[in-house]
Amino acid sequence: MEAVLLPKSWNVDQILDDLDQHGFAIIDDAYSSEYIHQLVEECTSHLNQFRDAAIQNGIVSNIRSDHILWLHEELKISHQHTKTLYVLAEQFNRAFYLGINNVEAHFACYNSGEFYALHRDNPQGKNGRII
């Protein structure tokens, strides 16, 4: 199994500090323009696989109207991003004792007029999402 490292431009200590202090972290220039171009190419070559986005309660068109494609191993370029997120999750586990053992990510496509409204997609009693 290949070793996955966080990009050198990611300052893990700063990410952890920002998350601790503010509840979020912003990683400027997280990936190279070449990698982003590859992601866009992979995404656009799979547009026929996008599905209506849903929330915990199913498809609710007045909350979100975008279309998504969950990242998976067959999407080789974006799967590298998922593997990177697993490495970052390990850092979160060490720093905050979170117990993250699964990472999910998806592409989202917003056609003209589509939206994502503010909502809670992690209802009480079903708190499987940590970050």
Regions found by a protein language model. Name each.
Residues 2-95:
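Non-heme Fe(II)/2-oxoglutarate
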Residues 71-131:
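Catalytic core of non-heme Fe(II) oxygenases with the double-stranded beta-helix
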